[in-house]
Curated annotation (Swiss-Prot):
Signal peptide location: none
Record field: catalytic activity: 2 (2R)-3-phosphoglycerate + 2 H(+) = D-ribulose 1,5-bisphosphate + CO2 + H2O; D-ribulose 1,5-bisphosphate + O2 = 2-phosphoglycolate + (2R)-3-phosphoglycerate + 2 H(+)
Annotated cofactor note: Binds 1 Mg(2+) ion per subunit.
Protein name from the UniProt record: Ribulose bisphosphate carboxylase large chain
Residue numbers carrying N6-carboxylysine: 197
PANTHER family, sorted: RIBULOSE BISPHOSPHATE CARBOXYLASE, RIBULOSE BISPHOSPHATE CARBOXYLASE LARGE CHAIN
EC class of the enzyme, as a word: lyase
Pfam families reported for this sequence: RuBisCO_large (PF00016), RuBisCO_large_N (PF02788)
Cofactor or coenzyme needed: Mg(2+)
InterPro entries linked: RuBisCO, RuBisCo_large_chain_AS, RuBisCO_lsu_C, RuBisCO_lsu_C_sf, RuBisCO_lsu_fd_N, RuBisCO_lsu_N_sf, RuBisCO_lsuI
Organism, as annotated: Crocosphaera subtropica (strain ATCC 51142 / BH68) (Cyanothece sp. (strain ATCC 51142))
């Protein structure tokens, strides 16, 4: 209960909704907007819970403090301006909050997330809380560099147009020596792939130190380029235990002429990622981003952060590629939801579309796009669906789907390249890949023994599990 004091303010505890629940508020163009899915504790009204989220993620604390008189809370407080029941869910609500622009440091994803997903997620009045979406205002967007280069510049660097890019994660992910690792890279690139990739947990272990890997891989890239007359690359993972070590590895990659490096942006952190992205832009290096740890954060429907938020934040922090799921492979991803955040990664302007989980219209103010990477449990039979779903501005990455070929790495790469080229030709001729995709692959098998062997090996492989990431 609040009470007046000699210092001229009402001390004590008062309901959050008295200050932070403002249903008559109309958000400004400069406000950062957030949509939370909240599950209040029994007995807590949704208006009080929504106001508590607004307070604890902006200017509020658990009690009135006299220093409130030293600032203009009306200018700086977050405002819960709308609450909607979540369809088909008991005691769950979408809570919409507007935050004034001045609450956030320019060009800092770290600062935005510290406010929005900080202490409030441990708040006792809430049983669960999930950040579903953010609308970054253009005024804030313009303070971020974004992707080092973006999709259009990457295409020009590679001189590859009119089709998705093809990649492969080198397997086994751990245990190879640097020389054998470089051999696998060469065979895959020579067989027809555009890129190969370090797995997310390859850093600098006793069996393969980073410098040795970088040198053998660069030798493989240059040899494959000379023999195919195509630009090739390998995502050298520069993620390290410290930012200083990460930048040392990135600098060495630049010195040996590698075209692209890689970072694990969630385990490495947004501050490290933004630092690396700025370096990559300054030095003409592409930046591939892996999302290791994302499912810990985004897989539960009622608590955490949705991946569309992480994807938006990564685009602002900086990344030319980002893993996005496959829809058809072994990793989580329902089609409508996945394509919603894929559009948020690569399009300049995305309209609100609740059917795809997009709660706000987002204008990126001409910021370059991030290319989605489809990776995880995919093989040649998936190629028509992947081309139809993701389109040209994507990277299709086959790890086991390349290296698991019965004839070896290079034939596995050739099988994937033939399947891709066949699908692109069929699409350009007006054929419907969703309906005729398997026929397209079978026809291509007649003139590619490598593809025929791959199709025979993986004809029975499916990953039929219900997607958890649904509306």
């Amino acid at each position: 209960m609040a009470q007046a004091t000699k210092s001229g303010f009402n001390a004590g505890v008062q309901d959050y909704r008295l200050t932070y629940y403002t249903p008559d508020y109309t958000p400004k163009d400069t406000d950062l907007l957030a949509c939370f899915r909240m599950t209040p504790q029994p007995g807590v009204p949704p208006e009080e819970a929504g106001a508590a989220v607004a307070a604890e993620s902006s200017t509020g604390t658990w009690t009135t403090v006299w220093t409130d008189n030293l600032t203009d809370l009306d200018r700086y407080k977050g405002r819960c301006y709308d609450i909607e029941p979540v369809p088909n869910e008991d005691n769950q609500y979408f809570c919409f909050i507007a935050y004034p622009l001045d609450l956030f440091e320019e060009g800092s994803v770290t600062n935005v997330l510290t406010s929005l997903v900080g202490n409030v997620f441990g708040f006792k009045a809430l049983r669960a809380l999930r950040l579903e979406d953010i609308r970054f205002p253009v005024a804030l967007i313009k303070t971020f560099q974004g992707p080092p280069h973006g999709i259009t510049v990457e295409r020009d660097k590679l001189n590859k147009y009119g089709r998705p890019l093809l990649g492969c994660t080198i397997k086994p992910k751990l245990g190879l020596s640097a020389k054998n690792y470089g051999r696998a890279v060469y065979e895959c690139l020579r067989g027809g792939l555009d890129f190969t990739k370090d797995d997310e947990n390859i850093n600098s272990q006793p069996f393969m130190r980073w410098r040795d890997r970088f040198l053998f891989v660069q030798e493989a890239i240059e040899k494959a380029q000379a023999e195919t007359n195509e630009v090739k690359g390998h995502y050298l993972n520069v993620t390290a235990g410290t930012c200083e070590e990460m930048m040392k590895r990135a600098e060495f990659a630049k010195e040996i002429g590698t075209p692209i490096v890689m970072h694990d942006f969630l385990t490495g952190g947004f501050t490290a990622n933004t630092t690396l992205a700025k370096f990559c832009r300054d030095n003409g290096i592409l930046l591939h981003i892996h999302r290791a740890m994302h499912a810990v954060i985004d897989r539960q429907k009622n608590h955490g952060i949705h991946f569309r938020v992480l994807a938006k934040c990564l685009r602002l922090s900086g990344g030319d590629h980002l893993h996005s799921g496959t829809v058809v492979g072994k990793l989580e991803g329902e089609r409508g939801i996945t394509m919603g955040f894929v559009d948020l990664m690569r399009e300049d302007y995305v309209e609100e579309d609740r059917s795809r989980g997009i709660f706000f219209t987002q204008d990126y103010a001409s910021m370059p796009g991030t290319m989605p990477v489809a990776s995880g449990g995919i093989h040649v039979w998936h190629m028509p669906a992947l081309v139809e779903i993701f389109g040209d501005d994507s990277c299709l990455q086959f790890g086991g789907g390349t290296l698991g070929h019965p004839w070896g790495n290079a034939p596995g790469a050739t099988a994937n390249r033939v399947a891709l080229e066949a699908c692109i030709q069929a699409r350009n001729e007006g054929r419907n890949l969703a309906r005729e995709g398997n026929d397209v692959i079978r026809e291509a098998c007649k003139w590619s023994p490598e593809l025929a062997a791959a199709c025979e090996l993986w004809k029975e492989i499916t990953f039929e599990f219900e997607a958890m990431d649904t509306l």
